[in-house]
Amino acid sequence: MRKNFLLLALSFCFATASLAQADSLMNMLNDVPAENEAATATFKATRIIDGSSVENLALGVLDFRIDHRFGDINDVKNFFGIDNATTKLALDYGITKWLMVGLGHGVFNKEDDGFVKIKVLKQKKTGMPVTVSYVGSMSIQTTPAPSLPAGDTWLFSNRLYYTNQILIARKFSDAFSLQIMPTIVHYNLVDSTKFSNNTIAIGIGGRIKVSKRIAVTGEYYYRVTNADMLVNGQTTYNSLSVGVDIETGGHVFQLMLTNSQGITERTFIGQTTDSWAKGNIHLGFNISRVFTIVKPKEFRDGKGSW
C-alpha cells in the first residue's frame, strides 16, 4: 500500500508543474522516421474510450482530461440523464518516452485514482508484431462511511481498489488498429462473501479510421470471473462502448455511447449496473488537451522546432 501512495504523490508532483505553451497532439503521437520501422499512432489518444490504449505521452507533455458521462438517456425524471451526469478531471504526464503517470478525481462515487503506464515493447515492421504496455492503477472511494451495526468497524482499506492490465495492440494498417487487455481488478470490499475479491476480465478495443481526423472506436470487457457480481444489490453487466474520435489541433474530442457511467477501471469493468439490452445507455465525451512542459533536448539545442 505504501508504494501505491508514493505513486500517487509522484503523479501529483509532476501533474502540478507550471503549464507552458500548448502544442498539437499530432506532435505527441507523430510518426517516427521510416528507418526506425516502429509503428506509431496505433491510437490517437491515450484512452480508447474508457480504458487505456498503448499510447504514451511524450517526455515532458502534460495532458489535461475532462471525461463526462450523462445519466441514463431513458431517465425522463432526470431530463434524459442531464441532471445526474458525472465528470472526471485528470492530469497525465509523460516522464520518459516509455513511462507516464496520471492522477484524477471523479464525481461518480467520489473517487480519486492514480496510475502508471509502462511501454514494454514496440511494434516494428520486422521482429515485433505487437506493442505491449503495462498499466497499474489504484483508486480510493471517498464517499461517507455507511452506518454499521454496533460492534462493526469501517476500515479505510475498504475504500481501496487496484487494477493491473497488460495491453497488447497491433496496428494492421493506417486505418485499422486492434487491442486486447487482460485485466485483474482487486476489490478490497465486495457485497458478499460468495463473490471473489478479484475480477478477471478480457477487454478488446479497436479503431477504424474514416477520415484524416475522424475514427470510429469500440471497446468491450468480458468478465471471466464475478460475472454475477452484485453492487449494492444491483445486477452488473459487461461494459460495452462505441465512440467517435475527432482530432482538432491541440486536443482530441471523443464522443461515445456506453452502458457504463463510471469512468475508472474499478467501476466500468466490474461494477456496470446498466444494460444495452434494457436501453440503459449513457451519452458521454472525453476532451484531451496537451501542454508541453519540458522541451526535448534536441529542440532546446536549436536542432529542431517543437
Language-model segments: residues:
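Transmembrane beta-barrel domains of Gram-negative outer membranes and organellar outer membranes
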Residues: 21-153, 160-164, 169-180, 184-188, ...
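Positively charged n-region of N-terminal signal peptides that target proteins for export
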Residues: 1-5
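General helical structural elements
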Residues: 6-7, 174
